[in-house]
Amino acid sequence: EIISRQSIMAQLGISDARALFPCESAIKKVDNIFPRDVSIKVIQMLSAGNQRICLHGSGGCGKTTILQDVEKKLPKGSTMVVYDCYGGGRYLDSDAFRHKPVDAFIQLSNDLARLLRLPLLLSRSMNINYPKVFQKKLPSASSITASKAEDALLIIAIDAADNSVLAAQSQTPVERSFVHDFVSVGTLPSNVRLIVTSRSGNLSSLNLPPTFSLLEVENFKRTETAIHVSGNWDAPSTWIDDFHHLSRGNPRVQRYALDYSEENPAQALEYLRPNGKGLSQIFLEQFE
């Protein structure tokens, strides 16, 4: 008998993989990530024993990309699970909610199971305390991680956590985001780390305990803008100065401008003139 994905799902009594993985990540992998000082700082904090970190910054400053860079820099044998609260922008759509505790903790638990070969969390029941079940999985996940290498870490990251809270608060009646349960998880095994990311202006909505260390992700420095641009073309120094100024060093604004210019990257400045653009202005233009 051929063992297929469908036959396994049938044995588990499910017909749709979304029963096991209801909130798969929609995050796109970034190629050719260049090192930023903040990535190095995160690695230093994780290695020094900081178990709870919140990365915060303005929209488009590169928080999601920083997580990808951090994953590449983790000690040998480490594992990183990233929960995507943004969902490609669909986190407010009724058929794509990501804020509900049952969905989020099933996804997180089964991501751990998939990566570390642990038992799957299958049940959906009003009688299950999903945050508690998730926390009970951490010791075994920690042990498997430790068996891979002495310094190996297990990182569980919640990206764009503030969007999850926003989605929960937008419901009628108001609902609870899983983020508040996640940040309140109790004692962690020594090699487990929790990371959440958020826009700085929304930090208060996360209700972070004082055990979380805050680390701001700033926009690009001028030197970082130069490195970013070099992946597209060999721009003169004066052009880089103007591009950095008009984009305000925001990585996502720069990406939109460079994508707009397509095969003529020098035209990226025209996209930002005369006074520069922020993310909100770019989004408004896309809807017009």
Which functions belong to the PLM regions below?
Residues 2-5, 200, 210-213, 234-280:
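Amphipathic alpha-helical "lid/sensor" segments that cap RecA-like P-loop NTPase cores
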Residues 3-44, 120-121:
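Conserved adenine-nucleotide phosphate-binding loops and their immediately adjacent elements
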Residues 8-10, 27-36, 59, 269-288:
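Winged-helix-like regulatory helical subdomains adjacent to P-loop NTPase cores
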Residues 50-68:
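Walker A/P-loop nucleotide-binding motif
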Residues 66-155, 161-167:
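Post-nucleotide-binding-loop coupling segment downstream of the phosphate-binding loop, primarily
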Residues 86, 159-160, 192, 196-201, ...:
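A short beta-strand-to-loop transition that corresponds to the Sensor-1 phosphate-sensing loop
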Residues 146-149, 153-196:
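Conserved Walker B catalytic segment
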Residues 181-233:
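The catalytic "switch" region of P-loop NTPases
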